[in-house]
């Protein structure tokens, strides 16, 4: 079970590589805010940055499947004025929508869900807090092959590992 308010890594079910906000560890003068979420698939030993799940029903101690929740990047290193809450926004840089930070707690546009996907799980984005929701998958952008989380027809199968300490 995934516990509310406890940090977890979101990992692709077939890899140890996780997700982290783009540019989080770069020189702060080069930051472009808000920070889009990238995969660390090219760096399989990097498990990314943990997140905290907060269900819409804040009295729940366990995060339920197929219910609205906010995803909050759990990092002490943060240089952007925007929030650490995940949302989906259009990106001129990437030519489509991407999962990014800067969402608003408990508001439309920042709702995601965890759903079963075979033997794994998947994330879906529910912009209105109800259906239709869209699967979150991988979008490869540019010659450098950066892989961003984005609404896609093909979901990324994921698993969750509790962050230690």
Curated annotation (Swiss-Prot):
An MF annotation (GO) of this entry: serine-type endopeptidase inhibitor activity
Cystine bridges: 33-80, 126-133
Keywords: Disulfide bond, Glycoprotein, Hemagglutinin, Lectin, Protease inhibitor, Serine protease inhibitor, Toxin
InterPro entries in alphabetical order: Kunitz_inhibitor_STI-like_sf, Prot_inh_Kunz-lg
Residues glycosylated per entry: 27, 57
Protein name per UniProt: Bark lectin isoform 2
Subunit structure: Dimer.
Temperature-activity note from the record: Hemagglutinating activity is stable between 30 and 60 degrees Celsius.
SMART domains: STI
Family statement: Belongs to the protease inhibitor I3 (leguminous Kunitz-type inhibitor) family.
SUPFAM superfamilies: STI-like
Main function: Glucose and N-acetylglucosamine binding lectin. Has hemagglutinating activity against human and rabbit erythrocytes which does not require divalent cations. Inhibits factor Xa and, to a lesser extent, trypsin. Does not inhibit neutrophil elastase, human plasma kallikrein, papain, human plasmin, porcine pancreatic kallikrein and bovin chymotrypsin. Has insecticidal activity against the termite species N.corniger. Induces apoptosis in prostrate cancer cell lines DU145 and PC3.
Lineage top rank: taxon: Eukaryota
